[in-house]
Amino acid sequence: MKIDSKKRSRQLDELAAALPQRASALTRIFFARTHTGLSRAEVGVLAALSSRPFRITELAAREGISQPGVTQLVNRLQQRGWAERRTDPQDGRVVVVAITDAGRETLERVRSEYRALLHEEITALDDEQVATLASAVVILDELIERLGGRAR
């Protein structure tokens, strides 16, 4: 089905505005309905650290938080036993932040709660809606990768 260029342009603008809003809304709803004991920023940093250790400056850039803000956040995670500072094995002058086993367990608990909340709501969808949502996830994964990110 071909649509005219003005309508397509309008749809593209609406999608470009809607996607980040919807992603943010899902996150807000999750944190409002669950009691994880973590902030969104803490979960974001733990998720980043679950892939590899980071320098503070890298974390700040990745998460869109100031360097002093990330330092405070990492200090809180470290106090709770969820992150630790280590010497970078490639450059002994550099300190990196790494997730601990307790941090991984905490992150998995949060992710499990998030999945359970979404699963409960997705269960109420009909088969066609589930199939449409599954197709949308594949497209979102492709979009994330084209933007230089990792979908998973």
Each predicted region: which residue ranges?
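Exposed, interaction-prone assembly regions rather than primary DNA-binding/catalytic cores
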Residues: 131-152
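A structural signal for well-ordered alpha-helices, especially hydrophobic packing surfaces
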Residues: 23, 27, 53, 141-144
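N-terminal helix-turn-helix DNA-binding core of bacterial DNA-binding proteins
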Residues: 29-69, 80, 96, 152
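N-terminal leader segment of winged-helix/HTH proteins
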Residues: 1-40
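Short, locally clustered residues in the helix-turn-helix/winged-helix DNA-binding domain
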Residues: 47-51, 111, 138
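DNA-binding alpha-helical recognition surfaces that contact promoter or target DNA
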Residues: 72
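Charged, amphipathic alpha-helical coiled-coil/dimerization segments
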Residues: 75-135
